């Protein structure tokens, strides 16, 4: 709800000003449209101030400022970008579901996305724990497998506990 970008009605068009961070796929040659979220109703209740609108990527006033890295990985040109919008005019028919519905739309998408990413990360953590257990049985130090040296049981047990807590939260 803390958005400073604006979407203002001007006749038969909306005028967009602001920036969009983490615009996925903006460098891909097939990227032709963007979904922009900005404040359209500043005097409305907090969760009804924003709207979302479809913006043709080739609209005058859109500038790709830079590509963004994720955890140090550069996914350019197909990854995420930082875009600037200056007086971008879009037909009013491009508004999605009507003015003031942007937050609602965003929440409808973010909820399932969060669940997806949690499941994916828990799966990766399970695999990492499996590899840790195998290594503790196969890697020898001081003539014994690491698992028999005692100090590794609590590490493995704590990993299992953390994983189960993540699964339940």
Residue ranges: model-predicted function:
Residues 1-3, 32, 60, 81, ...:
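Short beta-strand or tight-loop elements
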Residues 12-13, 17-65:
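A short core secondary-structure module
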Residues 169:
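A contiguous, well-structured pocket-lining segment that forms one wall/lid of small-molecule binding clefts
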